[in-house]
Amino acid sequence: MADINSKLEIGVTTGPIRGSRKIHVESARFPGLTVAMREIQLEPSSGEPPVRVYDTSGPYTDPKVTIDIAAGLPTLRRDWIMARGDVEEYDAREVKPEDNGLKGPDRSAGVPPFPNVVKRPLRAKAGQNVSQMHYARRGIITPEMEYVAIRENLGRKQAKEAMIRDGQDWGASIPDYVTPEFVRDEVARGRAIIPSNINHPESEPMAIGRNFLVKINANIGNSAVASDVASEVDKMVWSIRWGADTVMDLSTGRNIHDTREWILRNSPVPIGTVPIYQALEKVGGVAEDLTWEVFRDTLIEQAEQGVDYFTIHAGVRLPYIPLAAKRMTGIVSRGGSIMAKWCLAHHKESFLYENFDEITEIMKAYDVAYSLGDGLRPGSIYDANDEAQFAELYTLGELTKRAWEQDVQVMIEGPGHVPMHKIKENMTKQLEACGEAPFYTLGPLVTDIAPGYDHITSGIGAAQIGWYGTAMLCYVTPKEHLGLPDRDDVKVGVVTYKLAAHAADLAKGHPAAQARDDALSKARFEFRWRDQFNLSLDPETAEQYHDQTLPAEGAKTAHFCSMCGPKFCSMKISQEVRDFAAKQNAGIETFVANEAEAEAGMKAMSDKYDEMGRELYIGAGGREHD
């Protein structure tokens, strides 16, 4: 496949993240099952153990794996799926010209369709249900559940021993240790999902639920005016390198089908889509021409390819559309506006709502999870928490129960633009209306005044709602509201949201969350610069900023940085105070009990300070820099 790769000119970033190595933890329950993790190596002189962190990068950071984009990734889950005996191969539907869009410029940039398309996808045998929820409700612990349990337990043993548990969990049930049985129970209750289409065996199982680590999603995809297949594959690999737990392909231009195939065959994380986008392309971009038959065909097409979760805006009902008329910014969801336009044009109830049970039948045949879309989410803080938003939310709760009746996994999408004082209400109402199904929110953005910085305005809201219980945060890039993000924007968005998710885990009291913070803080206090870089969310940027002012190699062992310099470094001063105190107390077995002796000691040290010229550092020189 090397010749094909060179012709395709699809380049992706591979190799270990700096200062880290890929490790694999073996399962005791399922022979041969190993879970990939990242281990950050610390300076040997520190005497500190390596720090293990959650790894979403898949084989791309494993130096032992040869990456061949034209061949796709290894099919990790194929044997697990086949061993259950409830699936069958069948002839896939024929790819039609309209599957790749009928309007707009070609976005292939010379990249042909994926060369190794599976002609015979899998589906459930007649009368079978292959969803992880179905297995969980029958008491079955699948390899996927075992994988999740091992993956989620990062550092928990050490954290428990060190008694690092602090925070406010707002009623969550975060265990000290995640067992496969706990994972099974959470999935059975509907409080967590494991997005895992049987036609995406390349994916590494992960869980989305408020009793697990907070996850993040990165959006990619072409548009009618920008990007191409190669760029979107590169952005997918780039986003998971920096920590995206799932990726949504939101392509709206030409070559939608081919772009998605390339992404799926090379993605180790779950892939989500909004099928109405492709359905709209199939009818030439005219919302009024959409039909249930076109949409149904699109669902099957994408399920056969391996899409793990569908955003479906079934809560945008005809009676709710007038509620948005009084808004400042109306309906801002693309999917929501498409369905609103269809409903008004035909003056009929949404065909997504009317055919919801049939959609669910398709979902359970492939184990596609619902991501019930918030088509009436607020697009400005003026519209936050209004009647339209919450009317849709309660309908999503109704639909959740209907999906659960067929053992189909569900998560709920949320806003949007919400000021900080209104965020908690969103979480409270979602838990109440949707039976604790995982909440998946875009931000929310807490103010509308910062175009170009909306990764920050939304990161603030994301950290807050993640603390309250949101299970997955959809990233926002600096280009939000302005344009299609490039790979640099993708990285900024992912790192910002990894920060928000981690802050939420800390605030909730996640048992393993603080280990990395403590390791970095200790490295900072001990001036282990390389360890500080490597323990950070973005080692490259951390070192780049350090080297802009102190580029010399020796500066990476210096006990100061350019912010304060050697004389005013608070941590250096603290170390000297600590060392001095240790020397003074060497050999003393008990504290001084006599108050007079203590006072005399204090005066002696004060006199000594006067004799030395009142300098914090002996031999530090004069006061020319005051």
Curated annotation (Swiss-Prot):
Protein's UniProt name: Phosphomethylpyrimidine synthase
Gene name, Swiss-Prot/TrEMBL: thiC
GO MF annotations, alphabetized: 4 iron, 4 sulfur cluster binding; carbon-carbon lyase activity; zinc ion binding
EC number: 4.1.99.17
Pfam families: ThiC-associated (PF13667), ThiC_Rad_SAM (PF01964)
InterPro entries from the UniProt entry: ThiC, ThiC-associated_dom, ThiC/Bza_core_dom, ThiC/BzaA/B
Cofactor note: Binds 1 [4Fe-4S] cluster per subunit. The cluster is coordinated with 3 cysteines and an exchangeable S-adenosyl-L-methionine.
Known cofactor(s): [4Fe-4S] cluster
Amino acids binding substrate: N219, M248, Y277, H313, S333, R334, G335, D374, G375, L376, R377, E413, Y440
